[in-house]
C-alpha cells in the first residue's frame, strides 16, 4: 500500500524518532515503495514493537513479529523481486526517514516452501547481515553505531544460496531505552526470488517468534555510562562464502569465549564482530 502525500507529510515530523522499511534497493536501483516490501496494518506504520509500553498491542512474542502487524494480508498484492545470488541489496526507510536511535541493524532470510507471497514466515530464519558499533571513539548514544542517521540497511545475498523464493526481514533495534526493558524493533519483509545460486545450506537458524527473548542481554543493554561492547542477538551470520562481511565473527572463538562481540576496527562501518556472549540458549538450531 502506497502512502498518500498527505499521510507522508503527517508522518514526516516523526521520521527521526520512528520509522518503517518500505523500499527494496537492488544493485543500487530503488524500486517503488511497497512494490516488493509488505506493508502493515498498524494505525501508525512507523510504530515500534516492544515488550514494555507496547504500541498497537504488538510484542515480539506474537506471530506478526515475523514481518510486522497484519503484513501477511498484503502478501498477495506484493510483487516478488528476482535477484541474483551474490547481488547487493538494501532495505530503505519510507518517507525520507533516517535511523536516529542507537542500535544494531540485522537482516534475516527464510526460504518459502513455495511462493513467497503465500508464505507467512513460520519456518526457519537465518541471518545474512549484522552491523553494530562502528567507531568506539564516538558517542554510544548516537553516532558510534553503523546505522546512525542512515536511511537504509545494505547487505549481500550469499552467493551459494539455493535458488528459490524467500522472505528478507530487515530490522533495526533501538536500544536507547533497553536499559529499562524498552528495546524498540523496526522491521519489515521483502519478497524475493533468488536465481543463479548454489548448494548452500544455512544451519544456524531461529524462528520468529521465539528467537528473541525479553531477558536477552541484547535487549537489556544500556547506552548510558560510556562505551561498551554490544551483544548481538540471534545466530551467527551465514555468509555462504561471499555474503555480507559486516557483522561476521569467528565462531570457534565465540564458542569458547565469555566476551561480548567487539569491534575489530574503529572508524569504519565494516564492523567485524568475531566474539559473542552466549548468555543463554538463543533458541537457534545448530546441525
Swiss-Prot record:
It catalyses: [(1->4)-beta-D-glucosyl]n+m + reduced acceptor + O2 = 4-dehydro-beta-D-glucosyl-[(1->4)-beta-D-glucosyl]n-1 + [(1->4)-beta-D-glucosyl]m + acceptor + H2O. Residues 274-287 have a biased composition (Basic and acidic residues). GO terms for cellular component: extracellular region. Cu(2+) binds at residues 18, 186. Transmembrane segments: none annotated. It comes from the Eukaryota. GO terms for molecular function: metal ion binding; monooxygenase activity. Disulfide bonds join 67-189. Induction: Expression is moderately induced by cellulose and xyloglucan. Expression is induced on lignocellulosic substrates such as sugarcane straw (SCS) or steam-exploded sugarcane bagasse (SCB). The promoter contains the consensus sequence for xlnR binding sites (5'-GGCTAA/G-3'). A cellulose response element (CeRE) 5'-CCTTAAAAGG-3' is also present at positions -799 to -790, as well as the degenerate binding motif 5'-SYGGRG-3' that binds to creA involved in carbon catabolite repression. Belongs to the polysaccharide monooxygenase AA9 family. PANTHER family: ENDO-BETA-1,4-GLUCANASE D, PUTATIVE (AFU_ORTHOLOGUE AFUA_1G12560)-RELATED. This is AA9 family lytic polysaccharide monooxygenase D. It comes from Emericella nidulans (strain FGSC A4 / ATCC 38163 / CBS 112.46 / NRRL 194 / M139) (Aspergillus nidulans).
